[in-house]
């Protein structure tokens, strides 16, 4: 199956929850992931949406969702939250997107060449801002 962070049901590829209310033992971190999974504006892997094809192996989200996700995890000042944040933003470096007025394709021919485009909100990729670990180290100092 897909990789899900131990102690969570929503952190990782897909989710392992049977319904929205179900959370893992790392409840606070899991809530951040669940909220991010329910972001309104996203483009799944290889999907064409907002005038752009997502060539990443995972879903990319609107930057508002990724910024909320980062803040949610950082507020917890917790090792598990830091691990999830560092994996998503620093290791996988999953970008987010902003929408800008631009020209997007709306119709293609058999060879996948654009035959009709129009002015519409078009997705522009934004590099993931780094995640700063927030948990206290064993000596009591921040990392």
From Swiss-Prot:
GO terms for biological process: arachidonate secretion; lipid catabolic process; phospholipid metabolic process. Expressed by the venom gland. SUPFAM superfamilies: Phospholipase A2, PLA2 (SSF48619). The active site is at 36. It comes from the Eukaryota. The keyword Transcription regulation does not apply. Its EC number is 3.1.1.4. One of its GO terms (cellular component) is extracellular region. Disulfide bonds join 11-33, 32-72, 39-65. Keywords: Calcium, Disulfide bond, Hydrolase, Lipid degradation, Lipid metabolism, Metal-binding, Secreted. Binds 1 Ca(2+) ion per subunit. It is found in: Secreted. Its main location: secreted. GO terms for molecular function: metal ion binding; phospholipase A2 activity. Ca(2+) binds at residues 10, 12, 14, 37. Its cofactor is Ca(2+). It catalyses: a 1,2-diacyl-sn-glycero-3-phosphocholine + H2O = a 1-acyl-sn-glycero-3-phosphocholine + a fatty acid + H(+). Belongs to the phospholipase A2 family. Group III subfamily. PLA2 catalyzes the calcium-dependent hydrolysis of the 2-acyl groups in 3-sn-phosphoglycerides. The sequence of isozyme pa3b is shown. This is Phospholipase A2 isozymes PA3A/PA3B/PA5. It comes from Heloderma suspectum.
């Amino acid at each position: 199956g897909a990789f899900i962070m131990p102690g969570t049901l929503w952190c990782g590829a897909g989710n392992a929850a049977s319904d929205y209310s179900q959370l893992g033992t790392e409840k606070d971190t899991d809530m951040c992931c669940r909220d991010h999974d329910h972001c309104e504006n996203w483009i799944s892997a290889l999907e064409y949406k907002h005038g752009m094809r997502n060539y990443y192996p995972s879903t990319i989200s609107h930057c508002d969702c990724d910024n909320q996700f980062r803040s949610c995890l950082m507020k917890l000042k917790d090792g598990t939250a830091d691990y999830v944040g560092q994996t998503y933003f620093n290791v996988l470096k999953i970008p987010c997107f902003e929408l800008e007025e631009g020209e997007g394709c709306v119709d293609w021919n058999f060879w996948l060449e654009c035959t009709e485009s129009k002015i519409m909100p078009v997705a522009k990729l934004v590099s993931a801002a780094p995640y700063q670990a927030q948990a206290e180290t064993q000596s009591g100092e921040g990392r």
